[in-house]
């Protein structure tokens, strides 16, 4: 990045977005409505500026349509974890918090990110209509699973008079789960049949794991093994200072992907010979079961990443322990 590179920070709220542009002859701060027509207007305003990077926080979905609109206009967009952005603000002494200040801070954060060699790991590929639909189905299934768990917990403590109501709700949620899962599987088969077949060639990856990876980890196959492990949050991070060597820890990353990968690895540790052998070898070396399982998660993820990058299915001769 040159000193004159243009970077943009966008603070996203439900009704509006605040935009801060740095690197122009004079900085720009402006507010737009958070709706499709305003998204197009913002993209049109930014496109002539030769923007190096646009940064916004993940806000539970309020940022999704804007990010897609800007990416579709050819602008590089990074949607970052809010904790990363807030930690950056604190490190810069920015303790005050308003929408306008946050937008400026995100623009400054963008100015740092564009200098990084691993910038590609921050920029999520553009989600097309099929991927957005699949992501919505994956999210809905996750919501239904959470609702089912809550109702089952209520049932354990319920007195007789309310049990029929809870049981009826459990039955209704179960039917909705079946419907959404069938819809999800059908969508994957219609639009991602080859990629799904590739992913599911690895023992441990079932239909839910495959759909989640396709929907929520579009970087799979585009990054190197270290970048993909760090992105998901299964890469051990150093914690050293001077002569002190701290314990390596995994932290950050995409929680939902990590949760799905955890469940897939539990299955793989029993039914995938390569992962099972790797897990057993780590236990024999004295590793704690949880440490060994995280290492297996990392191995499974990086193997899937290589499979997608090379477009080759699981091969025990290549992906052995």
What does each model-found stretch correspond to?
Residues 22-53:
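Nucleic-acid-processing active sites and adjacent nucleic-acid-binding tracks
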Residues 51-62:
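Short glycine-rich phosphate-binding loop at a beta-alpha junction
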Residues 207, 212-285, 289, 316-321:
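Phosphate-backbone recognition surface of nucleic-acid-processing proteins
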Residues 71, 78-203, 211:
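Long, charge-rich intrinsically disordered scaffolds of nucleic-acid metabolism proteins
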């Amino acid at each position: 990045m040159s000193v004159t590179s243009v970077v943009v920070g966008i603070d996203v709220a439900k009704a509006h977005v605040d935009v801060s542009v740095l690197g122009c002859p004079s900085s720009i701060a402006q507010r737009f409505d958070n709706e499709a027509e305003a998204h197009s207007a913002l993209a049109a305003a930014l496109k002539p500026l030769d923007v190096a990077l646009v940064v916004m926080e993940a806000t539970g979905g309020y940022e999704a349509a804007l990010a897609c609109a800007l990416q579709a206009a050819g602008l590089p967009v990074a949607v970052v974890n809010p904790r990363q952005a807030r930690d950056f603000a604190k490190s810069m002494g920015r303790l005050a918090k308003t929408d306008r200040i946050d937008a400026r801070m995100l623009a400054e954060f963008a100015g740092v990110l564009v200098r990084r060699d691993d910038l590609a790991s921050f920029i999520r590929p553009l989600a097309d209509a099929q991927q957005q639909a699949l992501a919505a189905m994956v999210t809905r299934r996750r919501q239904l699973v959470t609702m089912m768990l809550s109702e089952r917990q209520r049932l354990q403590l319920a007195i007789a008079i309310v049990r029929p109501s809870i049981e009826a709700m459990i039955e209704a949620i179960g039917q909705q789960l079946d419907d959404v899962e069938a819809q999800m599987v059908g969508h994957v088969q219609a639009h991602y049949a080859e990629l799904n077949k590739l992913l599911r060639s690895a023992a441990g990856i079932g239909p839910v794991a495959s759909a989640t990876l396709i929907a929520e980890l579009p970087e799979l196959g585009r990054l190197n093994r270290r970048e993909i492990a760090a992105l998901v949050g299964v890469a051990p991070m150093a914690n050293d200072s001077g002569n002190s060597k701290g314990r390596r820890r995994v932290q950050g990353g995409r929680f939902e992907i990590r949760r799905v990968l955890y469940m897939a690895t539990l299955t793989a540790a029993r039914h995938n010979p390569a992962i099972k052998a790797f897990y057993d070898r780590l236990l024999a070396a004295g590793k704690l079961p949880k440490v060994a399982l995280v290492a297996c998660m990392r191995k499974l993820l990086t193997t899937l990443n290589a499979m997608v990058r090379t477009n080759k299915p699981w091969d025990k001769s290549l992906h052995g322990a």
